[in-house]
């Protein structure tokens, strides 16, 4: 095996369970590396806080990885609190409120069940910095950690926390305006057989909604299996069948959401951002009159924001880059077309339940149906193709690539764009083409995808 120099992608460490780096021995060492850094930090601050909160989604491999992580952390003198299946943002919240030194989520988000991953939050509830990621990688890949283990009497313990779900439910409900309820609203809710299958229905039901559930029967292998935010078609059909007011679809770890209006039309992350940004600006709540999005967002969103006097700032793809930009400049709303929506007034990362409640609050406060809100802007035609590849390469160094892109951009004549990037979480390269003519941009996207599949297979 070639020497690995990186473990972290754009959203933590990911891989196939029981394959590198998601093997028990590697996960133990990852736990030890995190534990060593936390112990070192506590000693430098003369602090006794060496507590880590660990949550997970519903994947079969979550049990194995949970035990391996806890063992590694315990061996470095760190105390572990296991909270079981809970949305990723819930771990960020509990890390802060339980005064833990760190929080860890065991999840591969929207990936299939056979994948799993590790995301790490700092004591402030935000994902750790790239500098800390590099230091964890260095310890895992280059160091023998055995000499760094503390004496036997300083080994940590692990215990389970039983009321974590209730704490998260109360916290999320608290973001909904007190003067409103969801009484009389019928919601179809798809929890992707994932981390939110228990908490999400309770949140909406306790606020008064009638909830019809999909994807609420996890068995360890059916997470994201034709359900959840990547598969909103079934949700749309159910909304029409049950004559619901709205559909809400979460992904496996519930940090993102896609919605459906009462007519069965999909409301993606761009539209959720636009709906909330316009509503917040109207009420003087949008800090800096600015919305943060990514390069994947539709140009129609940018046009609508400009018309409304809202500045749109674009970052690299990945919710952590959106959060970095928001924190750096004090903005309070940002997100991605894929459904990661971040309300920094309430949370430290994308939260599908909070985002959905924010849209429902707009419906209640304006008296508008979801379909009325969904007409917030007109999409510029956009084609996205995900190509599975076997290797990565510097695209500009592939023979013929630059000429192909230049030729396509020339034909678009300033009325569109081409955006190509490797996924940070999957062996996939994403090809995005925007323009005025759908047939033309489809042809261009397929041409680029065919070229890349051939060159990178």
UniProtKB/Swiss-Prot annotation:
**Residues at the active site:** 109 (phosphoserine intermediate)
Modifications made to the protein after synthesis: Activated by phosphorylation.
Which species does this protein come from? Bdellovibrio bacteriovorus (strain ATCC 15356 / DSM 50701 / NCIMB 9529 / HD100)
CDD domains for this protein: GlmM
What does the record give as the reaction this protein catalyses?
A: alpha-D-glucosamine 1-phosphate = D-glucosamine 6-phosphate
- Kindly report, in one word, the top-level EC class recorded for this enzyme: isomerase
Q: Which Pfam families match?
A: PGM_PMM_I, PGM_PMM_II, PGM_PMM_III, PGM_PMM_IV
Family indicated by similarity: Belongs to the phosphohexose mutase family.
EC number, UniProt record: 5.4.2.10
Q: What is this protein called?
A: Phosphoglucosamine mutase
Q: What does this protein do?
A: Catalyzes the conversion of glucosamine-6-phosphate to glucosamine-1-phosphate.
